[in-house]
């Protein structure tokens, strides 16, 4: 009896010690980057999540296929995919993908080499083929819709191909419900992203080759060019509209064959360009291609920015989380996530609910970044572990 009592006491003490020991441990912070292989092709471009669904649509331009990707509803991990040809043949040049707000659940696509825009019903399941609901032919002299966007009740597209009639480049805009109500704005070579400044309602367009941003007053029809100073950088590409403390349009400079300058910019209601530059040596030669708003209530104003090897192998393929001071006048901190496959020419970044997706143009891959027991912007920089400031921050 005494032995049994002693044995029970020892078991209780050991179990209690294990429980107490387990409770003393803090959860381990981790971040994970996972690559998901898409159907093999040479150019994997744009993608977007269909709102209120677990479906992501991804364009592959080199074979004009639309990949429908199903996400796990809890983890957001890709779990299934099906690919569908779009256009008359594999040379139709599927590129732009943009969810419609006017037509909820529907998505705009661009066929760059067919000179068309499509409104499609993607279907609620990954194996269901998209249904074309509307086709908009780009009128002459416009040619080659690249990226497509819906702003208010109008559809916009940057026409990236040189006009066969005039040798010039244009931005296309049309009423969503009446495409015959359209306008072509002459621009420089060549328009990519088109966004609205939320306070003024002015439209801004990045033009990559001629490294300038065009401003459009849709009321008067007047346009104005805002050249990028060569001393700052070149090749304006990515652009987003942001609200709240980040209000305005933000854009990136992708650099050239020798790399980039780690520079991005902001245009607010004043219409003036304010440039920002990455401070960390890792970003010094980065060509910045695309970006997304990463602002959170707890973390404050922030951006996700893609550094890409698209124009130069001297520019790393990386996803960068940039935070700002409360007034958004200077960069406060940077977190670098090097892509697993370098020289993959990372192309677009799209935040989901709790994870972030990145497309890799030349390796038919979709990468996903996820965090556990921490959040973006709180990861301590590995390259500074010997810095006393890091120990102070971690303590």
Descriptions of predicted regions:
Residues 50, 57-62, 101, 108-114, ...:
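Conserved beta-strand positions in repeat-built beta-propeller and related beta-rich domains
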Residues 320, 338, 347-395:
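Blade-level signature of beta-propeller repeat domains, shared across WD40, Kelch, NHL, RCC1
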Residues 32-38, 79-87, 129-138, 180-186, ...:
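A short beta-strand motif characteristic of beta-propeller blades
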Residues 23-42:
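A short helix->beta-strand "capping" segment at the edge of beta-propeller domains
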Residues 1-22:
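Fungal secretory targeting signals
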């Amino acid at each position: 009896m005494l032995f049994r009592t002693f044995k029970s006491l020892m078991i209780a003490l050991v179990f209690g010690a294990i429980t107490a020991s387990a409770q003393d441990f803090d959860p381990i912070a981790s971040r994970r980057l996972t690559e998901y292989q898409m159907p093999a092709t040479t150019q994997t471009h744009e993608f977007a999540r269909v709102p209120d669904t677990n479906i992501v649509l991804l364009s592959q331009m080199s074979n004009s296929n639309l990949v429908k990707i199903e996400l796990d509803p809890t983890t957001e991990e890709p779990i299934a995919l099906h690919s569908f040809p779009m256009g008359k043949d594999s040379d139709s040049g599927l590129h732009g993908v943009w969810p419609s707000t006017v037509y909820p659940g529907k998505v705009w696509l661009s066929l760059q080499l067919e000179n068309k825009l499509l409104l499609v019903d993607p279907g609620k399941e990954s194996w269901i083929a998209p249904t074309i609901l509307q086709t908009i032919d780009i009128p002459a002299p416009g040619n080659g819709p690249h990226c497509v966007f819906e702003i208010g009740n109008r559809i916009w597209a940057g026409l990236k191909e040189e006009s066969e009639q005039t040798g010039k480049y244009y931005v296309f805009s049309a009423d969503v419900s009446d495409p015959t109500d359209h306008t072509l704005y002459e621009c420089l070579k060549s328009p990519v992203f088109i966004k609205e400044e939320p306070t003024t309602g002015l439209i801004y367009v990045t033009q990559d080759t001629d490294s300038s941003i065009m401003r459009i007053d849709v009321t008067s029809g007047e346009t104005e060019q805002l050249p990028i100073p060569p001393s700052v950088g070149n090749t304006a590409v990515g652009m987003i509209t942001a609200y709240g403390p980040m209000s305005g349009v933000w854009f990136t400079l992708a650099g050239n064959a020798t790399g980039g300058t780690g520079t991005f910019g902001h245009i607010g209601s004043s219409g003036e360009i304010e440039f920002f530059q990455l401070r960390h040596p890792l970003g010094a030669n980065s060509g910045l291609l695309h970006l997304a708003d990463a602002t959170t209530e707890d973390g404050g104003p922030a951006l996700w920015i893609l550094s890409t090897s698209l124009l130069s192998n001297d520019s790393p393929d990386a996803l960068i989380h940039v935070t700002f001071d409360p007034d958004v006048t200077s960069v406060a901190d940077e977190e670098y996530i090097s892509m697993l496959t370098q020289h993959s020419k990372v192309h677009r970044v799209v935040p989901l609910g709790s994870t972030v997706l990145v497309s890799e143009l030349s390796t038919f891959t979709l990468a996903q970044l996820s965090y556990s027991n921490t959040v973006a912007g709180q990861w301590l920089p590995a390259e500074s572990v010997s810095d006393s400031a890091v120990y102070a921050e971690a303590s």
